[in-house]
Amino acid sequence: GEGFFAAVARKVSDGGSRVRVPKSRRTIFAPAGRRECAELARWVAEPGRMRFAAVADVYYAYYESQYEAVKMLAESLRVIASGVAMGQIFKERLKPDHALAMFCGLDRGAVPVAELSEEEALRFLRKQEAEAAAFAEGMNLVTHGGAALGFAKRIQNRVNNMYPNSLRIFNL
């Protein structure tokens, strides 16, 4: 889900070992610039409730109410995952991450929606060839029965399936 969760584990030792207080790390969140925010905001249904930040070269969305807490935790703890991975920005256009397709706050009007039949959806989830006629030119949100499956990009008569290799299905 999209709840706000934090977990900390402490190793129990046998003897009198010292308690190590983690040092504050440098900030890993770089606030998104004005241009980046404009591009990222068009992908979410309620951009006024979101804050956008870059971690390395990937942009993430955080709810405004949780951003400062997540930032503080990330500065002192090792964070495995946080926020909604929006994707990378190339030439002022977002290359969306799969997590964005799964985000319930995604604005479905940001890109054309390609509704697939069950057979076509299974082919998409297997990362097999897709019929270009089912997709609009450019980036598409791929759905089946109204549920988002991921993104695909049509370039002329070819479709680039952006479904992650690690999630594809092999037998069905």
Segments and roles (model prediction):
Residues 2-7:
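Short hydrophobic/aromatic beta-strand or adjacent loop that forms the aromatic wall/cage
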Residues 12-172:
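Polybasic, low-complexity RNA-engagement segments
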